[in-house]
Regions:
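Active-site metal-coordination/substrate-binding segment of hydrolases
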Residues: 1-60, 287
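Midchain, well-structured core segments that form catalytic/ion-binding scaffolds
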Residues: 7-17, 21-35, 67-195, 204-206, ...
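Short pre-catalytic strand/loop immediately N-terminal to key active-site residues, enriched for Gly-Thr
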Residues: 26-35, 240-245, 275-276
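Catalytic-loop motifs flanking and including active-site residues across diverse enzymes
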Residues: 36-43, 130-133, 227, 252, ...
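Short helix-loop-beta-strand segments that form the rim/entrance of peptidase-like active sites
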Residues: 49-71, 151-152
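His/Asp/Glu-rich mid-to-C-terminal helical/loop segments that flank catalytic regions of hydrolases
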Residues: 53, 128-147, 181-193, 229, ...
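Active-site-adjacent substrate-binding region
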Residues: 132-149, 156-158, 205, 215-263
Length: 301
C-alpha cells in the first residue's frame, strides 16, 4: 500500500524467500486477510468438489466447520460421537509440508484488583491505586516469559488486556507452554504473586482465576502414529518432504484428540496470521488440496 507506506519484505518475513515465483493473496495492508482459516475451508471444499465431480473412490468422509476456533471455543459443542470418525485432521496451519501434533498447554488468567480511591491531596498511607498494583503484579512475572522474547519450545505469559482506574483494575493473561511441568509452574507463579500481594495489601485486593483451555495432544497422538504416518506417506507420494513442528498455539484438534478423536493439524499455505501482513500462496493452497485428495486415496488402501 504505497499511500500508507505499508509493505512487507524478506527482512521481516523470512517465509517470503521461498515464495519467489508464486502467486500471493494479500490485503491492502489495513486489515488481516482471514486466510486463517478461510484458506482451510476453501481447500476442504475444493477437495470435496473434485471427489464428487470426478467420482473418485473414497471411504467414509466426514467434514465439519467449527466457529469460534480463534477464541478457543471451537469444540465446545462439537459432538464427536455424532461425527462418527476414527480419526480427523484440522486444516488450519501454515506450511503445507508440515503435519503437526504438538501444541501448547494453555490457560487463561483473569485478575481482578480492588483498590482504594482517596483524594490525592490526602492520600498518604491510605490510597491503593489498583493500576499501580497491576503494574507491580506484572513486574513480578519472569521477564524472559514475555512472548516477545520466546520461540520454539519456550513458554510465555501474555498480558492481553489491562484496563481500569484507581479503584479497580482488570488484567487478562494467556499462559502457554509445551511442557506440562513448566506450564504448571507458570500457573503457580501467578498464584504465588497473588498471595504475596494479598499479604502486602488488604486481603482480597487480588482475586485470581485461572482456567485451563486445552492441552498438548502429543502424548495422545504418539500412542498410535498411524494418523501421522498416513499424512507423511501421502506427502511423499506428491513430492513433499514431510516435517513436523511444535505449534506455538493451539488448534481445535488438540481438544478433539482428548475427546477421543485423534486430530493432527495440516498446513494451508497461509502465513503471518492474525495481522495485516497475512498472506496465502495460491500454489501452496493447490498443493494442500492435492495432499487431502492423496490422503483420501491412501486411506482406502
Amino acid at each position: 500500500n504505497k499511500e500508507l507506506a505499508i509493505s512487507m519484505g524478506v527482512e521481516e518475513f523470512e517465509s517470503l524467500r521461498n515464495k519467489i515465483g508464486e502467486d500471493l493473496i494479500v490485503t491492502d495492508g489495513t486489515t488481516l486477510l482471514g486466510a486463517d482459516d478461510k484458506a482451510g475451508i476453501a481447500e476442504i471444499l475444493t477437495m470435496a468438489e473434485i471427489i464428487l465431480k470426478e467420482n473418485r473412490p473414497h471411504g467414509n468422509i466426514r467434514i465439519a466447520f467449527t466457529p469460534d476456533e480463534e477464541v478457543g471455543r471451537g469444540p465446545d459443542h462439537f459432538d464427536v460421537e455424532k461425527f462418527h470418525a476414527d480419526f480427523a485432521y484440522t486444516v488450519d496451519g501454515g506450511e503445507v509440508d508440515s503435519v503437526d501434533y504438538e501444541n501448547f498447554n494453555a490457560a487463561d488468567a483473569n485478575i481482578q484488583i480492588q483498590g482504594l480511591s482517596i483524594h490525592p491531596g490526602s492520600a498518604k498511607g491510605k490510597m491503593i491505586n489498583a493500576l499501580h498494583v497491576a503494574m507491580e503484579f506484572h513486574s513480578m512475572l519472569p521477564v524472559n516469559q514475555n512472548p516477545a522474547y520466546t520461540e520454539g519450545y519456550e513458554g510465555f505469559n501474555h498480558l492481553c488486556d489491562l484496563h481500569g482506574e484507581c479503584e479497580h483494575a482488570v488484567m487478562s493473561y494467556i499462559i502457554r507452554n509445551h511442557d506440562e511441568q513448566l506450564f504448571e509452574k507458570q500457573k503457580e507463579d501467578f498464584r504465588r504473586i497473588a498471595d504475596y500481594l494479598n499479604q502486602k495489601y488488604p486481603k482480597d485486593t487480588i482475586r485470581l482465576e485461572i482456567k485451563d483451555s486445552y492441552a498438548n495432544m502429543r502424548s495422545i497422538i504418539e500412542k498410535d502414529m498411524r494418523v501421522v504416518d498416513l499424512v507423511k506417506k501421502s506427502m511423499k507420494d506428491i513430492g513433499i518432504h514431510p516435517s513436523s513442528h511444535a505449534i506455538r498455539g493451539g488448534t481445535d484438534g488438540a481438544r478433539l484428540t482428548y475427546q477421543g478423536l485423534p486430530c493432527p493439524n495440516l498446513g494451508t499455505g497461509g502465513y503471518n496470521f492474525h495481522g495485516k501482513y497475512e498472506y496465502a500462496s495460491i500454489q501452496e493452497m493447490e498443493k494442500s488440496v492435492e495432499l487431502l485428495l492423496k490422503i483420501v486415496e491412501n486411506n482406502l488402501s
